[in-house]
Amino acid sequence: EIYGDKLTLYINGYIKNLHDSEDLLIEVFAYLISKRPNIKSSFESYIYKAARNHALMFLRKAKRHIILTEEEMNFCIENTFEDEVCIAERNKRIYDCMEYLPSAQKEALYLVYIEGMSYKEAAAVLRKSAKQIDKLLQLGKKKLRPLLETEGIKSAFND
């Protein structure tokens, strides 16, 4: 429950199919239950790393198949209905703009700004150093700002 929706959206960022993302999430949890790995980092970092690996394995297997449908991601928070609609639309536009970034930058931005992970946690998930995460975020934000401005979004980052 705690990680379900977030991990489903994270996996969906890779495979672009919400139904398959939910199936992969179940596989990730089944893996964790059956293998009971010795987790040396934080559990959250480990589970995101496992989700990423399962998504990449899925994509390697799916290269022979054509994915016909793509689900849209919506990020909603509890607020008034009108605010939820505005926030969801804004977040969708941000996510759509992120699709134009290199995958490492997109993943770093997603983990730090959308999932709220620390640089260290994101570094563990992406198998990079915290300094590399910082650089990916800087480059990603630099490339993303002009795209967001064309969408009418002035400030997407809290810095």
Show which residues each predicted segment covers.
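C-terminal edge and immediately downstream basic/flexible tail or linker adjoining helix-turn-helix-like DNA-binding
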Residues: 124, 141-159
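Helix-turn-helix DNA-binding motif, specifically the short coil turn and the N-cap/start of the second
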Residues: 17, 118, 127-132
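Residues within the DNA-recognition helix of helix-turn-helix
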Residues: 3, 136-139, 143
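Sigma70-family region 2
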Residues: 26-42, 61-63
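A short pre-motif secondary-structure segment
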Residues: 108-112
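Arg/Lys-rich amphipathic alpha helix in sigma70-family domain 2
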Residues: 38, 49-69, 87
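A short, charge-rich alpha-helical start-of-domain segment used by transcription regulators
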Residues: 1-9, 13, 19
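Acidic, proline/glycine-rich intrinsically disordered inter-domain spacer in sigma factors
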Residues: 73-99
